[in-house]
Amino acid sequence: MNVFNPAQFRAQFPALQDAGVYLDSAATALKPEAVVEATQQFYSLSAGNVHRSQFAEAQRLTARYEAAREKVAQLLNAPDDKTIVWTRGTTESINMVAQCYARPRLQPGDEIIVSVAEHHANLVPWLMVAQQTGAKVVKLPLNAQRLPDVDLLPELITPRSRILALGQMSNVTGGCPDLARAITFAHSAGMVVMVDGAQGAVHFPADVQQLDIDFYAFSGHKLYGPTGIGVLYGKSELLEAMSPWLGGGKMVHEVSFDGFTTQSAPWKLEAGTPNVAGVIGLSAALEWLADYDINQAESWSRSLATLAEDALAKRPGFRSFRCQDSSLLAFDFAGVHHSDMVTLLAEYGIALRAGQHCAQPLLAELGVTGTLRASFAPYNTKSDVDALVNAVDRALELLVD
């Protein structure tokens, strides 16, 4: 592992060769050359499909495909690579848990506790399964620090509480609840915990054994990998208890017109031809990341967010919604609509996001209709911070009387 060098890290990203300033990594990360090359080589040189053909190239491809599963298991300190299921992304992973695990077990009146800080991907699937089963969704509110109020869980948990859905890291504030404490409360009541790791996996991948996590989901594209590939980790006994969501090739053991028997997990949950290119690309991203000190890289990103926050705080009307010195900086200006601001920033070459960030209940709790969000990554620089601040100043001159 090398000492983190921002300039060397940045040089690995072809998309940064232009003059733009990219501050939207919380939406999707840019891709390093290693991932671009691995994906290109797959499409250029690979032949065959995984877990199907018997010729040598197909067998080698299957081995690479399964080796990637092992890499993800190592990233999360999962006890077994068979606890790793390939999906299209975090959203599909959570929906799979809701439909394949929760739906067959929930009864009318059962409760699903969901934090108000959740991305819609960790709320809407639970609202859907509640409608389907007669269960109800119970809101876990924020505390004074704008974090899910984990200390309220003992009051919210009842004999009907079945599932806790909690994000590792907010995609708006960057706040991280005390997962260990929340999981302890939930497990003491016999609940199953679904952790949304879409943001957290990028900054500090969860140790699923140490935290005793039941289900954990993340997406490859936020972790410098390709789009369309995601991960669901589940404890072995929970995955085996899940009914397959999709039926088709390679998820079955035997099939007749009288019925079928499924493969064991994870393959019973992976019907059809998988996103092999996505798996190969994610594997390349993890191999590439292993050469860097993630903690040092995270410290760099956080320092840039702090520089930006401190500079913008000198402008009238500035409000920050940032938590815990995160690398995500959600902010707004009094009297300035976020859509107007982001439009001007785009004209000035600054790429960031504005709006509700797929977290409408959280924005309502924060008392705003939307915010701007600058999300800093290890490939960003102090020059990017200066460019953001200068662009904001130009925009404020036009937008504020």
Curated annotation (Swiss-Prot):
Record's protein name: Cysteine desulfurase CsdA
Effect of C323A: No loss of activity
Catalytic residue list: C358 (cysteine persulfide intermediate)
Catalytic activity: (sulfur carrier)-H + L-cysteine = (sulfur carrier)-SH + L-alanine; L-selenocysteine + AH2 = hydrogenselenide + L-alanine + A + H(+); 3-sulfino-L-alanine + H2O = sulfite + L-alanine + H(+)
Oligomer and partners: Homodimer. Forms a heterodimer with CsdE.
Function noted in UniProt: Catalyzes the removal of elemental sulfur and selenium atoms from L-cysteine, L-cystine, L-selenocysteine, and L-selenocystine to produce L-alanine, and transiently retains the released sulfur atom on a cysteine residue, in the form of a persulfide. Can also desulfinate L-cysteine sulfinate (3-sulfino-L-alanine), which is the best substrate of the enzyme. Functions as a selenium delivery protein in the pathway for the biosynthesis of selenophosphate. Seems to participate in Fe/S biogenesis by recruiting the SufBCD-SufE proteins.
Keyword Cytoplasm: no
One Gene Ontology molecular-function label: selenocysteine lyase activity
Phenotype upon changing C176A: No loss of activity
N6-(pyridoxal phosphate)lysine sites (modified residues): K222
Biological-process GO terms, alphabetical: iron-sulfur cluster assembly; L-cysteine catabolic process; selenocysteine catabolic process; sulfur amino acid metabolic process; sulfur compound transport
Annotated Gene Ontology cellular component terms: L-cysteine desulfurase complex
Keyword hit for RNA-binding: no
Protein induction: Induced in persister cells.
